[in-house]
Amino acid sequence: MDMANLTWLHGQPQSTGVLKANPEDFVVVEDLGFEPDGEGEHVLVNIRKNGCNTQFVADYLARFAGIHARSVSYAGLKDRHAVTEQWFCLHLPGKETPDFTQFSLEGCEVLASARHLRKMRIGTLKGNAFTLVLRHISDRQDVEPRLQAIATGGVPNYFGSQRFGRGGNNLVMARRWANDEIRVKERSKRSFYLSASRSALFNLIASRRLANQQQHTVLEGDALQLSGRGSWFVAKPEELEALQQRLDAGELMITAPLPGDGEPGTAGEALSFEQQCLLEQPELMALLKRERVDPARRALLLQPKNMHWEWWDDATVELRFWLPAGSFATSVVREIMRQDSSDADISE
C-alpha cells in the first residue's frame, strides 16, 4: 500500500530525513503490562537482540531448550534491523528452567527470565517504548512545531507499510487470492494476506475521514471507544452534543473499521460514509466475507504517550515515546518528515 497517498493530520511534512541510519537508531522495548507470576509451566525470557528477527530467535530458543518450535511463543513480531528488547515464552511442563547463562546467539543477550502460569500469545502486550534517532533533517524549523503538535494532537493510527509485506506483496497476493488466481493453503500466509486486506481498508477509511476534516467530529452512528478501552458503542442522534464534549475532553475516541463478515458496528451517517469508502475495494471486501473474518474496530487517531525529544544538532533529533500494542512508530515519523526507510516499523 502506498503510504504517500494517505492524508496527513498535520499537513504534508516539508523536511526530509533518515530513519534508521543504523539499527541503534531504532530501539524498541516491550512493555508487558504485568509481572511474571514466578511459577508455572511456562518460562518468560526477555532478550535484547540486534540484527535478528523474531522467528529466528524463537527457533533458536526452541533448539536451546530442547523443545518443539511450536512450544515457543511471543507477543508480536519485531523488526530485524533494530535494537529490540522482546519477551519470549517457552512451554516447559515438568522440565527444569534452562541455564540461560549458556545461551549464546550472536546479536542476542538474555536480560531476564521467570516462570509464568499462562502462555504468552500474540497481542499479550500492553505496548512498546521507542527511542528513535532521526538524522539528516533538512528543515528543523518545520520539524519542531510538528513534534509539538504530535505531542498534543497525536497522529493518524495508520497501519505501517510493514503490515503489507516487502513492496506491498501481501496485499498483491491478497488481491490475487480474492480473484481466484491462486490458492492459499498455508495458514500463516492466509493470516498475512487477510491482515493486510483489513489494514488497507482501515487506512483507506481513516484517510478519507481525515480528508473530510471529520477526525474530531462525532457523526451520527459513529462507533466510539472509551479512551484506552477496547469496546465501543454507537453514537445516537440525541446524544451527539454530549458525546462531542466528551470527545473534546479526551474521554472518547472515534473508531474506524477493520472490516469483515459481520456487523460493522456503526449506523446512520457513519455507516453510510464507511460503506461508500469500501465500494472502492470490492475485491478485498469479498475476500474478507468469503473467509469469514470477524470485523473489529480500531481508534482513528493515535496519541503517543510520554513523548519528548532532544536535538543533538540542527539535523539530528532523538525522539522517545510509548505506543499501545498494535500501533506503528512510523505512523508517528510519517507526520514529522519525509523519509525513504519505511520498513523499520512494527509495534505489535
Curated annotation (Swiss-Prot):
Its EC number is 5.4.99.27. InterPro entries: PsdUridine_synth_cat_dom_sf, PsdUridine_synth_TruD, PsdUridine_synth_TruD_CS, PsdUridine_synth_TruD_insert, TruD_catalytic, TruD_insert_sf, TruD_pseudoU_synthase. The lineage of its organism: Bacteria, Pseudomonadati, Pseudomonadota, Gammaproteobacteria, Enterobacterales. Residues 154-302 form the TRUD domain. One of its GO terms (cellular component) is cytosol. The active site is at residue 79. One of its GO terms (molecular function) is tRNA pseudouridine(13) synthase activity. GO terms for biological process: tRNA pseudouridine synthesis. Gene3D superfamilies: TruD, catalytic domain (3.30.2350.20), TruD, insertion domain (3.30.2340.10). Belongs to the pseudouridine synthase TruD family. The keyword 4Fe-4S does not apply. It comes from the Bacteria. Substrate binds at residues 26, 128, 328. SUPFAM superfamilies: Pseudouridine synthase (SSF55120). Transmembrane segments: none annotated. It catalyses: uridine(13) in tRNA = pseudouridine(13) in tRNA. Responsible for synthesis of pseudouridine from uracil-13 in transfer RNAs. Keywords: Isomerase, tRNA processing. It is an enzyme of class 5 (isomerase). This is tRNA pseudouridine synthase D. It holds the Pfam family TruD.
